[in-house]
């Protein structure tokens, strides 16, 4: 394979990137330290996701942040003739958007070389036929004009990844192999984790592919439900109709679910309004809805006569569809949210889902498991979000030693947790770099399903991990001494205990919502602080905007029934209809100026994701307490401050 064109090495100096794009050749040792943690938010910033074809080439890497600089301009990779990108660890972290490798490939990139890759990004590259490698030695060999064989590029990949890359991508592979897939019928052999037991029940037998479901083995599974959101549905439709023509014969269309949850507040998004993107929003939504209508698919869309959507996808999946012991696949990295019920839920890319629409088969590379035992008793006022931010700050997780793993949460703290709180943990496995997160079903699961869905669910004998199941790592985490946590701007892994914050951080915007923090119990926590403030004659601080956004209409109705809405409005909060909103940089709650500071209950704060300002992550009570104080404080700090002034 002859790779021609320029090599762009992403380091920690913006000027070095500009010089390379201008035509200068720099060697690895001249660039120095490689830029790590390049996120998909940087490769294709959120507003660019309104494009779903080769137009994306213009926007590849336009959000790349090096320090406070963004050195890659619009269409820069195309103009420079870049064919190879080189970077450091955890390349492609963040959302599951296939737009990122699609944009790179459309811009002329043939190979991405990085010290390590995030799972979904690399799988998306495979599915598109875009090669990736962790061998930095390739860089100078390519520069010297040496041909690199496909055999060498796939040598360290699992058999399935190699087969897909050789075929030219997943759709080409699927045409030949997936339509005739049958159950693999893997027997329970030896001690297994709950995740392994679920996968073994849904694994498929693919001609020419030997799969024993051991870690690192690539294969396919059947999912009970496949869901797709509006950012990805038009791209999937475009790919499928281009490949197979129309009409399509979809596999079990009754189990395909469409969601419009990201863009229902685009008309109030500073970014979308400023850039004049509303016509593109409408076109994208029209394409999404047309695909649903053409094939008779369920679509949970925008509310009629009011702002917002019916629900955020993950929140509704757990409220209405997911069940213990089953498999759910969705085109969003936070699909593991449903793992709180004890199902195997994982995020996939657009081509993965497009192929699954046709065949019912979802690509899965089996992963190692990490057991996270939460010990002790969680102190009053400390939440699952605080636990998640603490886990993200652990060196083991920050250094990527659990990358691509299955996180199983257990221990007395989990046993005492509600499903809403468990979902915060499984949801944020995405930020931990995991494949999925799971909690074994128990009496709380049964209670939740009966109370929320009217289901009398019976837990089957096999729905637990065996005592001697094998784990790559076991993390014992003592929650007894845990206090409110924060994540400093730039990365959810920038965790710091609020008690250790040695500076006063004034707040301009406070946001509570998203799939992570828009559930019933989250609103119980918001209300606890708001009611205390109201009872003590307090409201949100001058010049602070507080936005609270429910995850589903059921959560909104829950708040109405309990009288929460009156309290929230009385302290000065603006209530928003269900939508991803500010978390997706698509609605009220995002910053408009670089000097603005936001405190948010969302799940990630990568550069540029919440607007040009600085985003601090926190728990629901800390968000509302900070809005009232006008600076970052815990609820306890707020109460102490109020009694001493």
Spans of model-derived segments:
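Fe-S-dependent hydro-lyases/dehydratases of central metabolism
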Residues: 1-645
């Amino acid at each position: 394979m002859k790779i021609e064109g320029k090599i762009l090495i992403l380091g920690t100096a913006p000027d070095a990137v500009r010089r390379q794009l201008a035509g200068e050749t720099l060697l690895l040792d001249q660039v120095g330290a490689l830029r790590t943690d390049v996120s998909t938010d940087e490769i294709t910033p959120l507003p660019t996701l309104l494009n779903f074809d080769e137009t994306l080439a213009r926007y590849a890497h336009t959000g790349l942040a090096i320090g406070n600089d963004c050195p890659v301009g619009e269409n820069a990779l195309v103009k420079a003739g870049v064919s190879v990108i080189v970077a450091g660890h955890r390349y492609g972290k963040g959302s599951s958007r296939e737009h990122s490798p699609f944009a790179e490939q459309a811009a002329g990139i043939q190979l991405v070389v990085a010290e390590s890759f995030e799972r979904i990004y690399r799988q998306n590259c495979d599915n598109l036929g875009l090669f990736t490698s962790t061998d930095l030695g390739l860089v100078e060999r390519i520069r010297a004009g040496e041909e690199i064989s496909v055999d060498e590029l796939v040598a360290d990949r699992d058999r399935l990844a190699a087969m897909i890359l050789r075929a030219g991508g997943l759709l080409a592979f699927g045409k030949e192999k997936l339509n005739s897939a049958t159950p693999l019928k893997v027997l329970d052999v030896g001690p297994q984790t709950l995740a392994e037991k679920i996968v073994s029940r849904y694994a498929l037998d693919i001609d020419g592919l030997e799969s024993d479901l051991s870690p690192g083995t690539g294969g396919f599974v059947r999912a009970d439900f496949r869901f797709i959101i509006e950012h990805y549905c038009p791209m999937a439709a475009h790919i499928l109709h281009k490949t197979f023509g129309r009409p399509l014969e979809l596999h079990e269309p009754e189990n395909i679910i469409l969601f419009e949850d990201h863009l229902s507040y685009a008309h109030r998004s500073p970014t979308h309004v400023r850039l004049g993107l509303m016509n593109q929003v409408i076109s994208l939504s029209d394409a999404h809805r047309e695909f649903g209508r053409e094939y008779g698919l369920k679509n949970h869309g925008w509310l009629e006569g009011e702002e917002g959507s019916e629900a955020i996808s993950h929140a509704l999946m757990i409220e209405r569809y997911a069940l213990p012991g089953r498999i759910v696949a969705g085109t969003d990295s936070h699909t593991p949210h449903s793992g709180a019920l004890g199902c195997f839920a994982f995020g996939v890319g657009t081509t993965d889902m497009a192929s699954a629409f046709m065949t019912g088969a979802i690509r899965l590379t089996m992963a190692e498991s990490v057991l996270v035992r939460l010990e002790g008793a969680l102190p009053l006022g400390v939440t699952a979000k605080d636990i998640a931010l603490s886990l993200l700050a652990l060196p083991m997780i920050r250094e990527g030693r659990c990358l691509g793993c299955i996180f199983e949460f257990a221990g007395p703290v989990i046993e005492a947790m509600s499903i809403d709180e468990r979902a915060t943990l499984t949801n944020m496995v995405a930020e931990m770099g995991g494949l999925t997160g799971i909690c074994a079903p128990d009496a709380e699961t049964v209670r939740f399903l009966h109370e929320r869905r009217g289901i009398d669910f019976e837990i089957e004998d096999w729905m637990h991990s065996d005592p001697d199941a094998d784990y790559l790592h076991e993390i014992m985490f003592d929650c007894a001494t845990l206090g409110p946590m924060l994540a400093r701007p730039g990365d959810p892994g920038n965790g710091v205990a609020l008690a250790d914050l040695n500076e006063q951080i004034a707040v301009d915007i406070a946001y509570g919502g998203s799939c992570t923090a828009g559930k019933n119990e989250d609103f119980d926590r918001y209300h606890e602080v708001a009611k205390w403030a109201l009872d003590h004659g307090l409201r949100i601080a001058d010049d602070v905007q507080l936005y609270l956004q429910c995850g589903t209409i059921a959560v909104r109705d829950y708040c109405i029934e309990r009288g929460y809405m009156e309290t929230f409005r009385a302290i000065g909060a603006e209530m928003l209809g269900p939508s991803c909103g500010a978390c997706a940089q698509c609605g009220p709650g995002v910053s408009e100026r670089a000097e603005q500071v936001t405190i948010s209950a969302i799940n990630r704060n990568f550069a540029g994701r919440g607007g040009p300002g600085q985003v601090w992550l926190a728990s629901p009570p800390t968000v509302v307490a900070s809005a009232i104080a006008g600076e970052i404080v815990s609820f306890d700090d707020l109460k102490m401050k109020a009694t001493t002034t």
